[in-house]
Regions:
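Glycine/charged-rich beta-loop-alpha catalytic/anionic-binding loops adjacent to active sites
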Residues: 82, 86-94
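Second-shell loop/turn segments in exported
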Residues: 20-29, 47, 93-102, 138, ...
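Short secondary-structure junctions
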Residues: 43-52, 212-224
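Soluble non-cytosolic domains of exported or imported proteins
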Residues: 27-35, 99-103, 107, 139-143, ...
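N-terminal capping segment at the start of a domain
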Residues: 1-38, 91, 282-296
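Acidic/histidine-rich catalytic neighborhood of metal-dependent amide-processing enzymes
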Residues: 68, 93-202, 208-212, 219, ...
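A non-catalytic alpha/beta surface segment that caps or lines the substrate-entry region
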Residues: 12-77
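His/Asp/Glu-rich mid-to-C-terminal helical/loop segments that flank catalytic regions of hydrolases
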Residues: 252-320
Length: 320
């Protein structure tokens, strides 16, 4: 096995097939993740456009039949309509392989794009966002999704149904995040945007659709619960609704659900940052404690559930 480099001599079966065949290159220590990702998008023959917003390179992927921004003379695909917009950040914290956060969700979405193409479904966009990970002291206004959301609105995509995927490679339990609910409840009126009622309504609609999709697919388990911050917070701060979805192993989901019953305030600790205190941090699911550090390795992934995720994304597009 190659130590700390690209592909292993014993590459797992799932990583031998497109689009996952560049996954191990993507998580290598010195990987040029932007270059690898854009080349892989080209290799699987999807249209794409890279849009730089305040120094962050966001990669948009379109169905093969849709023109990219450049070839459409500046008109963004689906402008004025309500496509599904699936987001996943492709940056990672320095020193972490980023196997689950968030490399696997990136490749899952490419796999979902191929599945959607096979079914002839083309009312979707994917955006791989830059700068989801913030450094100490940075506000959410520095998050890539915050400045991107402002552009999305100016492109006529304010009606897009945004689903954000983060850390979706470990376990089979889908966690439908309620973090934005807590932020809205704890925010002072001065920080709320004028269209906040519309945003709240849209978040509820996205969540209902996620739950309906899970029911339609007969997923074994779904949990509504607060989760660590993701791009949904940046979207929210800019006045766009987005629903984050993540995944956990069943035993961790059970323990977390029990914790939330005993400690209804625990979600507020995530919002305030107090969860970082050692006494509280150890209560987080183990999967989440492994993120943003050297423990976020491929050994923690559960490939037997990868298709479940892809089917969920496809299911979102085949609903209402």
């Amino acid at each position: 096995m190659k130590s700390n480099e690209g592909k292993s001599m014993t590459t797992p079966e799932w990583a031998k097939h497109s689009p996952y065949d560049r996954y191990f290159d993507f998580i290598a220590p010195n990987a040029d993740r932007y270059a690898i990702l854009t080349k892989q998008i080209s290799a699987i023959k999807f249209n794409s456009t890279v849009i730089n917003v305040e120094g962050n390179n966001h990669i948009f992927v379109f169905p093969a039949g849709q023109k990219s921004l450049r070839s459409a003379r500046g008109v963004f695909p689906f402008s004025g309509s309500d496509p599904y917009l699936f987001s996943a950040h492709y940056d990672r914290v320095a020193g972490s392989p980023g196997a689950n956060d968030n490399s696997i969700a990136v490749f899952h979405l490419l796999s979902a794009a191929l599945a959607l193409a096979q079914k002839g479904i083309d009312r979707w966009l994917i955006v791989f966002t830059d700068k989801e990970e913030l450094t100490a002291g940075e506000s959410f206004e520095k998050q890539g999704s915050f400045t991107l959301a402002k552009k999305i609105k100016s492109w006529g995509l304010e009606k897009a149904k945004i689903f954000n995927f983060d850390a979706c490679g470990t376990g089979k339990v889908f966690i439908i995040s309620t973090t934005t609910d807590l932020i809205l409840k704890t925010s002072g009126q001065n920080s709320l945007r004028p269209n906040i009622r519309k945003v709240i309504k849209n978040i509820a609609s996205l969540r209902d659709h996620a739950l309906e999709t899970a029911q339609k697919l007969r997923l074994e388990r779904v949990l509504l619960a607060p989760t660590p911050f993701s791009d949904d917070v940046g979207f929210l701060r800019a006045g766009l609704a987005a629903q984050t979805v993540t995944m956990l192993p069943a035993n961790e989901a059970n323990q977390y659900e029990a914790l939330l019953r005993d400690r209804p305030d625990f979600g507020n600790l995530i919002i305030s940052g107090e969860v970082k205190a050692p006494a509280e941090y150890r209560r987080l699911p183990e999967t989440w404690r492994s993120l943003n550090n050297a423990q976020d390795t491929p050994s923690r992934l559960t490939p037997e559930y990868f298709n479940t995720f892809v089917n969920f994304v496809v299911g979102l597009c085949t609903g209402k």
